[in-house]
Amino acid sequence: MRNERNLKHNNNKIDAVFKKLKEEKRKAFIPFISIGDPDIETSFDIAKTLAENGADIIELGFPFSDPMADGKVIQRSYERALKNKISMEDALNFIKRLKTFKDVPVVLFTYYNPVFVMGEKFAEGAEEAGVEGVLVVDLPPEESGEFIKYIEDRNIYQIFLLAPTTDADRMRLVLSYAKGFVYYVSVTGVTGARKSLPETVKSNVTEIKKITNLPVGVGFGISSKEQAKDIAKCSDAIIIGSRIIQFIEDNINDKGLILKKIAEFSKDIRSVL
């Protein structure tokens, strides 16, 4: 059944982005921000700034009150966004609006509860908004059958995480469900910028690539263009969240400076990929 549905759709923009980048011998820059941090309008301007300054795909986090996979920087980002009472409907409208500005592929990063509450209506809303991918942090592939059916019928991919602790059998299972790209978590633990990344990242990504033809993006901990350039040698995409969100936190009362810093950082990262 899953294969039949896969044959129906083959024009997800995530695939097109990676195909084009491969032809150009470049790697994808995938920034992450939280919808509604520090407020809905500023976060929208940040998303636009990223789209204008080299983002190939944008990952947008739906603020959640108990983000188990996220470090302190993203937790605080979600706390700021939650004060603005961002609903899933707000998030989908945000994406729809972003798409009218620039049709950059969007992956919605969420936890399962907000999606579960909406059921199939979530998939309908995501399709209407133009979402290309959904990363549900706490929904493992073997429990996502109904959810995958809802979204794949609408040509939306579920993006899955692989960690350094994922064993070979588990990796094969996850990859059998994966579409678009696979998100390799470079370090054990939670998100957050780090001064150095484990030596095992490259060898682990190489092992993943032996099992799948899907592009592999690396995230968690990348905070500089030097790290990005190094990791890009073995991966197909660089995913950066905490470092970008730190610019928001450090300049919370100066929107112009937030946008300037993020634009400069994005151009810097893009230049080495």
Please annotate each region the language model reported:
Residues 2-103, 120, 257-261, 267:
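Conserved N-terminal beta1-alpha1 strand-loop-helix module at the mouth
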Residues 9-21, 66-74, 86-94, 115-119, ...:
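Active-site-adjacent beta->alpha loops and helix N-cap segments on the catalytic face
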Residues 29-33, 58-60, 106-110, 134-136, ...:
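Hydrophobic faces of well-ordered beta-strands that scaffold small-molecule active sites
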Residues 31, 50, 61, 126, ...:
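Conserved, mostly hydrophobic/aromatic
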Residues 41-49, 166-176, 218, 222-238:
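Catalytic cores of alpha/beta
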Residues 57-66, 133-135, 140-143, 184-193, ...:
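Glycine-rich phosphate-binding active-site loops on the catalytic face of alpha/beta enzymes
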Residues 71-107, 150-159, 163, 200-216, ...:
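Alpha-helix-loop-beta-strand connector modules within alpha/beta enzyme cores
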Residues 206-212, 223-229, 233-273:
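Alpha/beta catalytic cores of nucleotide-metabolism and tRNA/nucleoside-modifying enzymes
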